[in-house]
A protein has these predicted regions:
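Extreme N-terminal starter segment of soluble prokaryotic enzymes
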Residues: 10-16
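Beta-strand initiation motifs
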Residues: 12, 24, 121-124
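Short loop/turn motifs at secondary-structure junctions
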Residues: 13, 45-46, 92, 160, ...
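Residue-level signal for inorganic ion chemistry
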Residues: 14, 29, 51-54, 187
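N-terminal phosphate-binding loop and adjacent alpha-helix
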Residues: 18-36
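Cys-nucleophile CN-hydrolase/nitrilase-fold catalytic domain and related Cys-dependent amidase chemistry
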Residues: 34-121, 126-127, 193-199
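Active-site catalytic loop in hydrolytic enzyme cores
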Residues: 73-78, 104-185, 189-199
Length: 199
């Protein structure tokens, strides 16, 4: 794993995990993430930022099942924190970005969270709610979740960052807004459907 230089001369150890979740099974997929935390703990140099896909702990195509698997950002952060502490031998700080179905203010969203683990409590640095929901072809996301209403940069240990979820990145306005807000790093989570003859 090579350092990814950015932030004007700083570098960060970044890990990107391809993660194919068991559809609709938050607890099972959380357990698999614990195995991933243990693998990361054994790496040297150890990653400082772990990125997982959109809807990493439930799968993407849930349609009406979103309500059953949606969690609050606080619940997800606590679950990740407890799992991380139980899965590693030395709980050094680890920043994690992953997509999840979020329940917020009695509405459901396709969201991404940036959370710092390893301290006495998890630190939720930002939650981004997907703004551009696809409603074409095989996609009908707007029937099951609400649109997010803002996109902005936020502070991390590495500088200003921003989160986008899948189709948000197809619209140049989102990148322009976060760049104007000082983002030096944009983390995009996505779960495009598989294509081709592979299982």
């Amino acid at each position: 794993m090579n350092p990814s230089p950015y932030l004007y001369g700083m570098s960060i150890q970044l890990a990107i995990a391809q993660f194919s979740p068991k559809k609709g099974d938050y607890r099972f997929n959380l357990g698999r993430l614990g195995d991933l935390f243990a693998q990361i703990d054994a790496l040297e140099p150890r990653p400082q930022l772990l990125c997982l896909p959109e809807s990493a702990l439930t799968g993407y195509f849930l349609e009406g099942g979103v309500r059953e698997v949606a969690v609050t950002a606080g619940t997800l952060a606590r679950d990740l924190h407890e799992l991380y502490r139980a899965s590693v031998t030395s709980p050094r700080m680890l920043d994690v970005v992953l997509g999840f179905y979020e329940e917020w203010q009695n509405k459901l969203y396709n969201s991404a969270i940036y959370v710092t683990l390893g301290g006495s409590e998890p630190i939720v640095r930002h939650v981004h709610r997907k703004m551009f929901l696809p409603t074409y072809g095989m996609f009908d996301e707007e029937r099951f979740v609400e649109r997010g209403r803002e996109v902005r940069a936020f502070d991390t240990p590495w500088g200003r960052a921003a989160l986008l979820v899948c189709e948000d990145a197809w619209h140049s306005i989102t990148g322009a807004i976060v760049a104007l807000d000082g983002a030096q790093l944009i983390v995009l989570v996505a779960a495009p459907p598989a294509r081709g003859p592979w299982p």
